[in-house]
Each structure stands twice: as C-alpha cells, then as structure tokens.
Amino acid sequence: MDKKQLEESVNNRRTFAIISHPDAGKTTITEQLLLFGGVVRKAGTVKAKKSGNFAKSDWMEIEKKRGISVTSSVMQFDYAGKRVNILDTPGHEDFSEDTYRTLMAVDSAVMVIDSAKGIEPQTKKLFQVCRMRGIPIFTFINKLDRDGREPLDLTAELEDVLGIESYAMNWPIGMGKGLKGLYDIYNHRIELYRSEDEGQAFLELDDNGEIKGDNPLKDESIYKQVLEEIELIEGAGSEFDEEKIAKGELTPVFFGSALTNFGVKTFLDAYLKYAPKPAAHKTEDGSEVEPDRKDFSGFIFKIQANMNPNHRDRIAFVRICSGEFDRGMDVFLERTGKKLRLSNSTQFMADTRETLETAVAGDIIGLYDTGNFQIGDSIYTGKKAVKFEKLPQFTPELFMRVTAKNVMKQKSFHKGIQQLVQEGAVQLYQSYSTGDYILGAVGQLQFEVFQFRMANEYNSEVVMTPMGHKIARWIDPEQLDEKMSSSRNLLVKDRAGMPLFLFENEFAERWFMDKYPDVKLTAKL
C-alpha cells in the first residue's frame, strides 16, 4: 500500500491493555467487548465452569480450572471502523513481569476497578507503569450491579492514591438492587438499567440537564442525590481535556457492570473516540520509529508455548511498530543479524487463530517460532538496523530445584523446561557444581503453574524442592573464582551461561562483599 493508505490503516488501529487487581472483572469486560466486536455470541463468565462456558481470553487449561488469568491473551476485532487489539493481562502479582512487558506493546490502558474495593495494590503498581510510559489511561469502575462504595469516595481515592486527575463521563443512579441507571454526563442523556437481553434504553436531557418528556425517575430520591453530586463534581472537578488524556495526566472515568453488560458499549464508543492511534516507539539509541515509516519493524514482547497442545507449537507475539507486514516477507533479526522469512503468521482470538496475510503498525501478530526468537528481539526491514529499547525483566526472589519424577521421561522433561522458560514466566539456572536445574520466580503461583503445565502439556511430572535462597546477584566472569561458592551463596549460571550467586539473605550477601571487596555484584545484567 502507498504512504497515504498506510497512514489511514495505522490511524484506524487502537491497541490497549486491560489492567486490574485480580477479580475486579477484567476478563468479564473483555468478553463483553468481544460481543460488540461480533467475535463471540455469548460471553462466558469465569464462574460458569459447570456449563462449560469459559472466558474466551482464559484459554489455558489451568485458567479454566482455577478461574484466574495467568497469561496475557491477545484478541482482535473490528468495530465502528476501527481495528481493535485487546491485550487481556494477568491480574495476579506473580505474573506482573508478563503484564509489564505487555504494557510496552500498547498505546493505552483500560484500568478496571471493583466498585466495592476501590484502588487495590496490583492496580496501583500497574498504573504506575502506565504513568511511567506516559500512556493514556481510561478507567472503568465495575460491578455496579452489586452494592459498592460511594462514587464520590471512589473518584476521590482515584485522584488521591494514584495522583491523576479524573473526569466522570457518567455517574451511577443507585447501586446493587437499587441500580436505576447511569447519568451520562458527556453524552447528555440517561441510560436506564435494563437486563442484558432488553438492550439499551436512553432518556435525552435538555439544556438544563432535565429529562425531556416523561421522567420515570422523578420520584426516586436517589436521582435527586445524583443531580446534587453531579453539580458538585462539575463545579469542583477537573474539566474534560483531550490533551491531558493523551498525555496520561487525566483519566476519563466510566461506571458500569461488565457482568450484566451495562455501560460497556457507552464506554467502548467513547474509548474509540478518544484513545490514541499507534504512537512512535523508542529505540535503544534514544531515537524514535514513527508508525508510518515505510520500512517494517517490530519487537517480540511475549513467547507462548502450546497454544495448540496437539501440535506443541510456539508463538512469538510481535507488536508492529512501523510499516506493513506481508506474509512471506524477509526480515532481519537484530540480535543475530540473520535474515528470516516470515511465512507462518497468525492473528488471534485467545487460543483460536487464523492465517494472517497483512498487518500494519499498531497490530499484534503471531509468528510460529522454531527457536529463532527471544523475548525482547527486534525485527526489521531496510538498510538501517532497528533495536527497540529493552523490555523489563524482574530479578527472581524465590528459587526451587526441579527434577523429573520419572527418570525415564528425561526427554519430555528437558523439552518442557526449555519451552516454558522461553516464555519468561520463570527463570532457569544451573548449579555450577552439580548441574541441577534451579527455577527462579517472583511469586509462588508461577511455580504452581509451571508444575501443572509440565504435567498437563508435556506429560512430565516434576519434583519441586524449595530453596532458602532469596537474592540473585550476577558477577563478572573475569572476577569469578568457583571457591567463592558455599551453601549460603550458591554459584549458578543463567541461560546465557553468565555466572551469578544466589544468597540466602542480605546478611549472606554483605558477608560475601566484606570478604571479597573488589568483586562487583549486580542485581541485573
């Protein structure tokens, strides 16, 4: 396509992540958005296991069994003239590294908050990452169908705890069993609360904010309270400011109930209107790659094994940063300088997919990987090499020895470990002295998921033995003496063969540094 066609296609892309604390309803709202995109006919809720209706975005076996998201899912659909790329992220803190990497691949974020709980720890952490990147944040306060905290308390907490201005796009008229509707401040109307199969019902407002014609809410005391609250926030709150939204300084706030699909369409319509088109991406040398640049470029932010367990495949997820992708094109892999032909490409609906012929900047595509790619790799066309900035990597704080339960199944054991480690959910180390495999993780749940997937996907039961070590520190190979190792500071090597010590605690680390004052230890490579 020519430059003008490329620019138009790129401008129609909207790529965002949904972030929240566990159980705020993130996966449920994702399902409802897919309904509007015509991708699914019925939203499966996480709770509906007996009926077999699992959330479309929770595709992994362990997610279906436990009702949690443990991996980022990618879903695409067309709606109102836009191509929407949604990345549904794990809410559980043990999988925050996967979520952080995902946030590097999006142009905006939707923050889902439970109306009964307000801002929770994981929400705050993920918000801060978005803030650091300066990406726009849209807020959906969920679960209006249940009793929750006062709306004024929730918006005040949003501003106080997160330090961001907010603008209420709508305001709840009641909550729980007393929910009557939403006062749509921005669209100047009232959206009545109806059951999902009844569809939307609106009452238009006149210039004074009064309902035109018959007012079914005139005798409701809650409605009078809502009018007073709206007068208060319009007088004392922030004004709607598109420029501040684009800079991530102001968050538009929407109320609704994802479970009953109430207020979700209103949110989606407004989001697509004000969310940013694909932005430029920074490279490691500090320059930026514009999305309408003719040459193709992108980076791999995720690798997922066994999305189709029948084929034991691996998919590398790519955020396209510039230009146009065509199936069968040749690209350079920046890390090796090697030229690769991208003949097997796919687009996603969580675990289902279809062959992808073309895509443009802003899109998320999948490449079948035979072992060429690593998380953080840059790929590009053209004469000038492109290397995008590094993706975040967490230093593990928990460690376990892992061995095969059945020594006769060493082949599947090794294959499983290598593939799952390449996804980046756990880190792999090997003892210098014994060659034992040691796994490192940020949280306990990562180990549980690893153990489950080894048995479920590779038919390899494993024995996990907890270790008392808590701190990982790398050492320059030239300064290394294997005699430095002891039970309290265990010498291991990472996947790249670089040496590091695992310390039991800060005291053990200080003791080591006092004994070897000239040795330089680093927390990350």
Swiss-Prot record:
The keyword Cytoplasm applies. NCBIfam families: prfC, PRK00741.1, small_GTP. This is Peptide chain release factor 3. SUPFAM superfamilies: EF-G C-terminal domain-like, P-loop containing nucleoside triphosphate hydrolases, Translation proteins. Its main location: cytoplasm. PANTHER family: PEPTIDE CHAIN RELEASE FACTOR RF3. Keywords: Cytoplasm, GTP-binding, Nucleotide-binding, Protein biosynthesis.
